[in-house]
From Swiss-Prot:
The gene is vpr. It comes from Bacillus subtilis (strain 168). GO terms for biological process: proteolysis. This is Minor extracellular protease Vpr. Pfam families: FlgD_ig (PF13860), Inhibitor_I9 (PF05922), PA (PF02225), Peptidase_S8 (PF00082). The lineage of its organism: Bacteria, Bacillati, Bacillota, Bacilli, Bacillales. Belongs to the peptidase S8 family. Probably undergoes C-terminal processing or proteolysis. Auto-processed to form active enzymes of several different molecular weights.
Length: 806
């Protein structure tokens, strides 16, 4: 809903204002100019606003290598030596800045500390000789679609709901005795309700650590916490990995460790996320799952590099890819990690239904949870009951038992309307648009079968109900059998700067039923359905635990290669193969990975960018093929790329003795004069004995890719009461930048400011809360939209949460 309405209003705005250079109540925070001395200073990530005296927390990376980095480089490093160097750097930093305080310290996968200080003191911190880089302490959130969460009572949980683990092959692995036994999986999340009956077996005496409250009790945020909303996300993730009760996770005998890094409301910051990763490595975790992220598409962000070094320490790091799809370039940190396994979300196979009833030609099925519910509604005369906009109060005093609710779009999410209808006893719902035309959205997993109508048909239906025509019969037929589909919300790559394909792999992430705390003292433990890449990632973390038990000698690189090499290629509803940056290598299959005796790495590869002005340009990549079998094998290789002006060649045959490795070089030549600017995909196919053993996705980009012109925007309180600071991220700068204000109903309120020729990176603007040349915004909640245009392309992004004007 947000995207459609905002897009319409934005077009109107651009046509009307033509992006002139006038500004209203927004003033750019002055940028500090660089001098030759700056070249000797530490690098700043995120273009932090260093003009305000307001205190902020930053992550400080030191030149002294972390334990993991030194080990990888073959250098001698010890905790005592590193601690001495860190203490020396801390003392220098505290002496250099005013009112600075060190918070957390890091040594295992990141060398440095977090520090709170006035922002205008950061330049002095950068000048400290031992400091390598400074990062802002950005916010991380759970990667689930909160508006689609559904709580399920224990007696309603059935084996039919527990489909996703068997679908990726967990049951077959269990039959062979591979259940994740002996493997430690770290859940770095909102905490875990480890007393849940389905999770008790997975925890030992040591549960993990709580970095929010700084104690050894990493439970979820409870109801009534004055700091914010109760959480259940980490418990759901833990159940998907390893529940062992009514619900069975992918690796039911794995040992779990919980690290609470996200607090009330499912929100946390960089300093705690890095601390959680550090502690998991130090505690001996074999696998770690991070179902969290932000909108920063940057491979060198502190959390992303922390996962890179965790992988180098032999811990398989699995992370969600984000929920900002379906557009490209939407993957965020830590999904941008070079080494970790980033996971996209899919929806399990289902039947798509067509519906007819009455004379309502716009009728379409929006979504459903169980196919049996759809069949129960088919060819059955039912009574329709009008229920306003579907809020809980609209059902008060109405008998919906065995009936179908008719509601109007607006105010609350479709899933909430369906949940309210179900609670009132309804067996179905009809929702009609609140704008002219049809509803575009389809929402899988609606708690009751839901049929959508256009505004015109909806008003016609309501008129009929008022006239006493309340009975109808729905005729539902299967229109298409859909295979496993990539979820629209699943974020896409590539990663900026590295141009890497992301996600690496995909797994089920829609309508996943798992364990949750109910926060109800009488019935504290329950089950819930959630969706998001947060739900996909623990499927892979569990799969890794199972594979690691089956293949205890495999390295993190071998496990990653096995999962990617043996994945199933996914096709969309039209039978077209999904792009690499939508599905990665495909959908994971546990048994395929366990049975693999040939491994190809890397599991995907990007050749990077080819500049238009360079004409003919050639790049090579060497792939490693590992023969894990006890016999000599002969491998053949095929190379392909879409797009004219691109040719491929390389090693066509490699013979590898038993338990040995071989090399194959893949070459791509691009005539950029014949190839249009854009992103192009290829594949390296490796066969042995006529059987495909690996399909390796490849990628290249000609000239300037169609990256988003703006990726994030937020509003916070300004240094003066009643003012605000706007923060936005421009990946390559912007020729035109506008800030537009929308009220809580997403109706356009006015323009906050318009700019031209902005630099790349983080930009900060002081705003006095006025619109359209000085009009003060009335008290209430608002959203801010950032619109940026550069080199003929434009993008827009809306604040994730509303801000309050008092």
């Amino acid at each position: 809903m947000k995207k459609g309405i905002i897009r319409f209003l934005l077009v109107s705005f651009v046509l009307f204002f033509a992006l002139s250079t006038g500004i209203t109540g927004v003033q750019a925070a002055p940028a500090s100019s660089k001098t030759s001395a700056d070249l000797e200073k530490a690098e700043v990530f995120g273009d932090i606003d260093m003009t305000t005296s307001k205190k902020t927390t930053v992550i400080v990376e030191l030149k002294e290598k972390s334990l993991a980095e030194a080990k990888e480089a073959g250098e001698s490093q010890s905790k005592s030596k590193l601690k001495t160097a860190r203490t020396k750097a801390k003392n220098k930093a505290i002496k250099a800045v005013k009112n600075g305080k060190v918070n957390r310290e890091y040594e295992q996968v990141f060398s440095g500390f977090s520090m709170k200080l006035p922002a205008n003191e950061i330049p002095k911190l950068l000048a400290v000789k031992d400091v390598k880089a400074v990062y802002p302490n950005v916010t991380y959130k759970t990667d689930n679609m909160k508006d689609k969460d559904v709580t399920i009572s224990e007696d309603a949980v059935s084996p039919q709901m527990d489909d996703s683990a068997p679908y990726i092959g967990a049951n077959d692995a269990w039959d062979l005795g591979y259940t994740g036994k002996g493997i430690k999986v770290a859940i770095i999340d909102t905490g875990v309700e480890y007393n849940h009956p389905d999770l008790k077996k997975n925890f030992g005496q040591y549960k993990g650590y709580d970095f929010v409250d700084n104690d050894y009790d990493p439970k979820e945020t409870p109801t009534g916490d004055p700091r914010g909303e109760a959480t259940d996300h980490g418990t759901h993730v833990a159940g998907t990995v390893a529940a062992n009760g009514t619900i069975k996770g992918v690796a039911p005998d794995a040992t779990l460790l919980a690290y609470r890094v996200l607090g009330p409301g499912g929100s946390g910051t960089t300093e705690n996320v890095i601390a959680g990763v550090e502690r998991a490595v130090q505690d001996g975790a074999d696998v770690m799952n991070l179902s969290l992220g932000n909108s920063l598409n940057n491979p060198d962000w502190a959390t992303s590099t922390a996962l890179d070094w965790a992988m180098s320490e032999g811990v398989v790091a699995v992370t969600s890819n984000g929920n900002s799809g379906p557009n490209g370039w939407t993957v965020g940190s830590p999904g941008t990690s070079r080494e970790a396994i980033s996971v996209g979300a899919t929806q399990l196979p289902l039947n798509e239904y067509a519906v007819t009833f009455g004379s309502y030609s716009s009728a379409k099925v929006m979504g459903y949870n169980k196919e049996d519910d759809v069949k129960a509604l088919n060819n059955k005369e039912v009574e329709l009951v009008e229920a306003g906009i579907g809020e809980a109060k609209d059902f008060e005093g109405k008998d919906l038992t065995g009936k179908v609710a008719v509601v109007k779009r607006g105010s609350i999410a479709f899933v909430d309307k369906a949940d309210n209808a179900k609670k009132a006893g309804a067996i179905g719902m009809v929702v009609y648009n609140n704008l002219s035309g049809e509803i575009e959205a389809n929402v899988p997993g609606m708690s009751v079968p839901t049929i959508k109508l256009s505004l015109e048909d909806g008003e016609k239906l309501v008129s009929a109900l008022k006239a006493g025509e309340t009975k109808t019969t729905f005729k539902l037929t299967v229109s298409k059998a859909l295979g496993e589909q990539v979820a629209d919300f699943s974020s896409r790559g590539p990663v900026m700067d590295t141009w890497m394909i992301k996600p690496d792999i995909s797994a089920p992430g829609v309508n996943i039923v798992s364990t949750i705390p109910t926060h109800d003292p009488d019935h504290p433990y329950g089950y819930g359905s959630k969706q998001g890449t947060s739900m996909a990632s623990p499927h892979i973390a569990g799969a890794v635990a199972v594979i690691k038990q089956a293949k205890p000698k495999w390295s993190v690189e071998q496990i990653k290669a096995a999962i990617m090499n043996t994945a199933v290629t996914l096709k969309d509803s039209d039978g077209e193969v999904y792009p690499h940056n939508a599905q990665g290598a495909g959908s994971a299959r546990i048994m395929n990975a366990i049975k693999a005796d040939s491994l190809v790495s890397p599991g995907s590869y990007s050749y990077g960018t080819f500049l238009k002005e360079n004409g003919n340009e050639t790049k090579n990549e060497t792939f490693t093929i590992e023969n894990q079998s006890s016999i000599r094998k002969s491998y053949t290789l095929e190379y392909s790329f879409n797009g004219s002006g691109i040719s491929t060649s390389g090693t066509s045959r490699v013979v590898i003795p038993a338990h040995q490795t071989g090399k194959a070089t893949a070459k791509v030549k691009v005539n950029t004069k014949k190839t249009k600017a854009g992103t192009y995909e290829g594949t390296v196919i490796v066969r042995e004995g006529g059987k495909t053993v690996a399909k390796v996705p490849t990628l290249l980009i000609v000239k300037e890719p169609d990256y988003p012109r703006v990726t994030s925007v937020s509003v916070s309180e300004g240094s003066v009461q009643g003012t605000y600071q706007i923060e936005t991220y421009l990946p390559a700068g912007a020729e035109e930048l506008a800030f537009l204000v929308y009220d809580s109903n997403l109706d356009f309120a006015g323009q906050a400011g318009i700019y031209k020729n902005q630099d790349k990176g983080y930009q900060y603007f002081d705003w006095d809360g006025t619109i359209n040349g000085g009009t003060k915004l009335p008290a209430g909640e608002y959203y801010l939209l950032a619109y940026a245009a550069n080199k003929g392309k434009s993008s827009q992004v809306l604040t994730e949460e509303p801000f309050t004007v008092e």
